[in-house]
Regions:
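Alpha-helical transmembrane segments of multi-pass small-molecule/ion transporters
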Residues: 1-335
Length: 335
C-alpha cells in the first residue's frame, strides 16, 4: 500500500481534494472567492515549474526545429480542431445536454486550447527512451505563446457560449503564465542559483504539484456550488460519460497521429516519441485557470490530465519494452 501511495500520491490527492471541494462546497464558498488567491497560486506554480527548466537543452533543437514545430502544430492546431468538431457532433447528437452539458462542452474546448504540460511530457518522453529536448522546446513554445493562442481558440470555438473578452484574457494569461516563467529563467542566469534549482528539481516538482492541488480544490468548490444549482439526472450522467470518452479518445488519437506522422516524415524513433507525448499532452494549471475564467466546468481539464497520466504510462512502458536498446532507456529514468 505504501509503495503504491508513493508512486501515485498525486492521483490519490487529486481525487481527495476534488471530492472534498465538491462535497463541502457551500461551507467553503468564501475560500474560493478570496480576491487574488487563484491568480497567486497559478503564478507561483508556473514560477516553480519553470525554475528547473534548462534553456540550454533547446539549442540543439533550434538547429533542427522540424520535430518541435510538428508537435506544436498538433498540440495547438490539430487537437483543438478535432475537439471542436467532436463537441459540435456531441451537441448535434444531443449527447451533451442541459446546463451541465453546456459547461462540460466549454470545459472540453478549454482543455484543447491549453498548452503542453510543463513537466510530464518530458518525464514520459525520457521514460520511453525519447528525446526530451524536443519536449522541453514544445513546452516553452506553447506556454510562452498560450497567452495569445489559447484565448483566440476559445473565442473561435466557444464564442457563443462564453462571455469572453480577448484583450483582458490575453493580458491576464501573459501576467499569470508568461511573466512567472520568464522571471524564473532570468534567475537561472545566475549559475549558482541555476545549479541549486536543477539539484532541487524533485522537491520543486512536489511543491508545484501541491500548488496544482490547491488550484483544483478551489475549482472543485466552484464546481460543487454550480452542480447544486443544476439538475443532473440521467442526462447529466450521460453527458459526463461522453466527456470522459472524448478526452481519453482524443488524447490517445493525437499521440498516435503525432507518433506515426513523425515516423512517416523520417524522424528518428526518439524524436517521434517526443513529438507523440508533447503533441498530445495538456497542462492542468493553465487549463484550470482558463476554465474558471470562461465559466466552464473544470472536470474536462482534470479528466484530460488524469487520463493522459494513465494512458501515457501504458504507452511509455510499451515503447520502452519495444525499444531496440532497452538498457539505454532504463538508465535515463524519471525525475
Amino acid at each position: 500500500m505504501i509503495p503504491f501511495l508513493k508512486r501515485r500520491w498525486f492521483l490519490v490527492s487529486l481525487a481527495t481534494v476534488l471530492a472534498l471541494g465538491i462535497g463541502f462546497a457551500p461551507r467553503l464558498e468564501a475560500l474560493a472567492k478570496l480576491p487574488g488567491l487563484r491568480h497567486l497560486i497559478v503564478a507561483f506554480v508556473l514560477f516553480v515549474m519553470a525554475l528547473p527548466l534548462k534553456a540550454s537543452l533547446m539549442l540543439a533543437t533550434i538547429r533542427r526545429p522540424g520535430a518541435a514545430l510538428l508537435a506544436t502544430g498538433i498540440n495547438f492546431g490539430l487537437l483543438p480542431l478535432t475537439m471542436w468538431a467532436t463537441v459540435l457532433c456531441l451537441q448535434q447528437g444531443n449527447l451533451l445536454r442541459g446546463p451541465l452539458g453546456e459547461n462540460l462542452a466549454i470545459g472540453l474546448l478549454v482543455a484543447a486550447a491549453t498548452p503542453c504540460t510543463l513537466a510530464s511530457a518530458s518525464v514520459w518522453t525520457r521514460k520511453a527512451g525519447g528525446n526530451d529536448a524536443i519536449s522541453i522546446m514544445v513546452t516553452v513554445i506553447t506556454n510562452v505563446s498560450c497567452f495569445i493562442i489559447s484565448p483566440c481558440w476559445l473565442l473561435l470555438t466557444a464564442n457563443r457560449n462564453v462571455n469572453l473578452e480577448l484583450a483582458p484574457m490575453v493580458i491576464k494569461l501573459g501576467l499569470l503564465v508568461v511573466l512567472p516563467m520568464t522571471i524564473a529563467q532570468l534567475l537561472r542566469i545566475h549559475q549558482p542559483f541555476a545549479r541549486w534549482a536543477t539539484s532541487k528539481k524533485p522537491q520543486l516538482s512536489i511543491l508545484s504539484q501541491c500548488g496544482i492541488l490547491a488550484m483544483v480544490f478551489l475549482g472543485a468548490i466552484m464546481t460543487g456550488n454550480d452542480l447544486r444549482q443544476t439538475s443532473i439526472g440521467l442526462a447529466g450522467l450521460g453527458s459526463f460519460s461522453w466527456m470522459i470518452i472524448t478526452v481519453l479518445s482524443i488524447h490517445t488519437a493525437m499521440f498516435f497521429v503525432a507518433f506515426k506522422t513523425s515516423t512517416w516524415s523520417g524522424l528518428s524513433r526518439p524524436d517521434a516519441i517526443a513529438v507523440g507525448f508533447s503533441g498530445s499532452q495538456k497542462t492542468l494549471i493553465v487549463g484550470l485557470t482558463m476554465a474558471v475564467e470562461a465559466g466552464g466546468s473544470i472536470l474536462p481539464m482534470i479528466s484530460y490530465h488524469v487520463g493522459q497520466l494513465l494512458v501515457d504510462t501504458l504507452i511509455a512502458d510499451r515503447l520502452k519494452r519495444k525499444a531496440e536498446e532497452p538498457g539505454e532507456a532504463e538508465t535515463q529514468g524519471i525525475d
